[in-house]
Structure formats: structure tokens, C-alpha cells
Swiss-Prot record:
Compartment(s): Secreted
Signal peptide span: none
Keywords, alphabetical: G-protein coupled receptor impairing toxin, Secreted, Toxin, Vasoactive, Vasoconstrictor, Vasodilator
Tissue expression per record: Plasma.
Listed name of the protein: [Trp5]-bradykinin
Family note: Belongs to the bradykinin-related peptide family.
Length: 9
């Protein structure tokens, strides 16, 4: 997972 990833988006 890359930095700044969002599990909600």
C-alpha cells in the first residue's frame, strides 16, 4: 500500500 492510501476511498 502506497503512503496516503485511504481504506475508505
Amino acid at each position: 500500500r502506497p503512503p496516503g492510501w485511504s481504506p475508505f476511498r
